From Swiss-Prot:
<feature type="modified residue" description="N6-(pyridoxal phosphate)lysine">
    <location>
        <position position="264"/>
    </location>
</feature>
<dbReference type="GO" id="GO:0035999">
    <property type="term" value="P:tetrahydrofolate interconversion"/>
</dbReference>
<comment type="function">
    <text>Interconversion of serine and glycine.</text>
</comment>
<dbReference type="GO" id="GO:0005737">
    <property type="term" value="C:cytoplasm"/>
</dbReference>
<dbReference type="GO" id="GO:0005759">
    <property type="term" value="C:mitochondrial matrix"/>
</dbReference>
<keyword id="KW-0554">One-carbon metabolism</keyword>
<dbReference type="Pfam" id="PF00464">
    <property type="entry name" value="SHMT"/>
</dbReference>
<dbReference type="InterPro" id="IPR019798">
    <property type="entry name" value="Ser_HO-MeTrfase_PLP_BS"/>
</dbReference>
<dbReference type="InterPro" id="IPR001085">
    <property type="entry name" value="Ser_HO-MeTrfase"/>
</dbReference>
<keyword id="KW-0663">Pyridoxal phosphate</keyword>
<dbReference type="InterPro" id="IPR039429">
    <property type="entry name" value="SHMT-like_dom"/>
</dbReference>
<comment type="similarity">
    <text>Belongs to the SHMT family.</text>
</comment>
<dbReference type="GO" id="GO:0005739">
    <property type="term" value="C:mitochondrion"/>
</dbReference>
<protein>
    <recommendedName>
        <fullName>Serine hydroxymethyltransferase 2</fullName>
        <ecNumber>2.1.2.1</ecNumber>
    </recommendedName>
</protein>
<dbReference type="InterPro" id="IPR015422">
    <property type="entry name" value="PyrdxlP-dep_Trfase_small"/>
</dbReference>
<dbReference type="InterPro" id="IPR049943">
    <property type="entry name" value="Ser_HO-MeTrfase-like"/>
</dbReference>
<comment type="pathway">
    <text>One-carbon metabolism; tetrahydrofolate interconversion.</text>
</comment>
Length: 481
């Protein structure tokens, strides 16, 4: 901070100096660090940093962002209200914010090689979930019909998830939802999707998932959507970084709208983006339709679903997008894919089963049902070893609390510099955790409370924890402040 102040003009330095003195009054915000002003929160920050540094982060939706992104999130942009769009705000004083948001829009389109005459983007959504609901709000009327991948098949809650007894997602509450599913191979069943769409006649067909390790057939989904005059939306939250790095098929070739988070494989802050096609489309009879998606999506974000955008987060998004446009980022996504495939192959070598028998992207879905243990138990046992994973449903599961699978992702550890040979070691740790867990289960039975009590004092898991710490701390922690 002091170094940056030295570069300011004399007049600005004087203002800053005055403000520093001014803020010594007790009722005003201070310039003290969090370690001085709130030791309790600072202590938690240090504990979390230690947890991330000494452990192995394998959750597919997590990543390490850069220091530049973190600095942007903590910048003075957090002070500014900016309801509306650039050039059309409901508050004054947004001349700099307008420049920021326009730059973020420009970078978002450039990162995904989009022509600004054909595509636009709203950079204001607070998260991926709000981006999705705003997109649905802009595209649909209440109780219109949607089809998305079922949650137990690897879909996301926001794609219309509901159970036999209850509508879970707001999407399923305000719209009529009929999911499509994977088949017994773990691949999306496009034939059944097409047959069900002919009966259900959706207004919106959604591609995208939170736990699907394979590429999407956007072209076929486009044809299915066109048969029923439906929009095709891709939620590329998990793979947006892979798309930017040219390691996944681009959904922009076939979709009307594309949503994403910015913090997963894209390595930005926690937020969302909505891309929309500006060009006109044709219906099944060849008639030109002007959907005006730009105004519909923008109005859905504000004022329909949100108030003022978080401009400090938008600054972080802009920084992350610049990073994602670099050759280094393309190399990163290539390494993510190699590491993910290595992880899958090493698990198979040790006799484990994978959904679809492999992966095309950043994650693998590990099926532990042949071993006779649940993903929820392995998640808890991994926690004891300081390996962070998440339980996940696999095809045929009926219990979301105790599913048969575990989702593993390579993005975070790849950001720390791990390569293929390092992921062989990671799989060794995972294999040992499973074997220890099976031994514990054989002794205490299958009830989760008994299992959790047994792993809490297990010396073998404590030994792995120490080895994990020694291994993990050999690698840096990006974004350290």
């Amino acid at each position: 901070m002091l170094k940056s102040l030295s570069k300011l003009t004399p007049s600005i330095r004087g203002v800053v100096s005055i403000n520093r003195s001014f803020c010594t009054k007790k009722f005003l915000p201070t310039n003290r660090s969090v370690s001085e002003s709130d030791p309790e929160i600072y202590d938690l920050m240090m504990k979390e940093k230690q947890r991330q540094f000494t452990g192995l982060e394998l959750i597919a939706s997590e990543n390490f962002t850069s220091r530049a992104v973190m600095e942007s999130i903590g910048s003075c942009f957090t002070n500014k209200y900016a309801e509306g769009l650039p050039g059309a705000r409901y508050y004054g004083g947004n001349e700099v914010v307008d420049q920021l948001e326009n730059l973020c829009i420009k970078r978002a389109l450039e990162t995904f090689n989009l022509n600004p005459e054909e595509w636009g983007v709203n950079v204001q959504p607070y998260s991926g979930s709000t981006a999705n609901f705003a997109a649905f709000t802009g595209l649909l009327k209440p109780h219109d019909r949607i089809m998305g991948l079922d949650l137990p098949s690897g879909g996301h809650l926001t794609h219309g998830y509901q159970t036999d007894k209850k509508k879970i997602s707001a999407t399923s509450i305000f719209f009529e939802s009929m999911p499509y599913q994977v088949n017994e191979t773990g691949y999306v069943d496009y034939n059944k999707m097409e047959a069900n769409a002919a009966l259900f006649r959706p207004k919106l067909l959604i591609a995208g998932a939170s736990a699907y390790p394979r590429e999407w057939d956007y072209e076929r989904m486009r044809k299915i959507a066109d048969k029923h005059g439906a929009y095709l939306l891709c939620d590329m939250a998990h793979i947006s970084g892979m798309v930017a790095g040219k390691q996944a098929i681009s959904p922009f070739l076939f979709c009307d709208v594309v949503t994403t988070t910015t913090h997963k494989t894209l390595r930005g802050p926690r937020a969302g983006l909505i891309f929309f096609r500006k060009t006109k489309r044709r219906d099944a009879k060849g008639n030109i339709i002007d959907d005006d998606l730009e105004n519909r999506i923008n109005f859905a974000v504000f004022p329909s679903c949100q108030g003022g955008p978080h401009e400090n987060t938008i600054a972080g998004i802009a920084v992350a997008l610049k990073e994602a446009s670099s050759p280094d980022f393309q190399e990163y996504t290539k390494q993510v894919r190699r590491n993910s495939q290595t992880m899958g192959e090493e698990l198979k070598k040790r006799g484990y089963s994978l959904v679809t028998e492999g992966t095309d992207n950043h994650l693998v879905l590990w099926d532990l049902r042949p071993q006779g243990i649940t993903g929820s138990k392995i998640e808890k046992a991994c926690d004891e070893a300081h390996i962070t994973v998440n339980k996940n449903a696999v095809y045929g599961d009926t219990n979301a609390i105790a599913p048969g699978g575990v989702r593993l992702g390579a993005p975070a550890l790849t950001s720390r510099g791990l390569k293929e040979q390092d992921f062989v070691k990671v799989v060794d740790f995972l294999d040992r955790v499973v074997k220890i867990s099976l031994d514990i289960q054989s002794k205490v039975g299958k009830k989760m409370p008994d299992f959790q009590r047994a792993i809490a004092d297990n010396q073998d898991l404590k030994q792995i924890r120490q080895e994990v710490k020694e291994f993990s701390t050999k690698f840096g922690m990006p974004g350290e402040l």
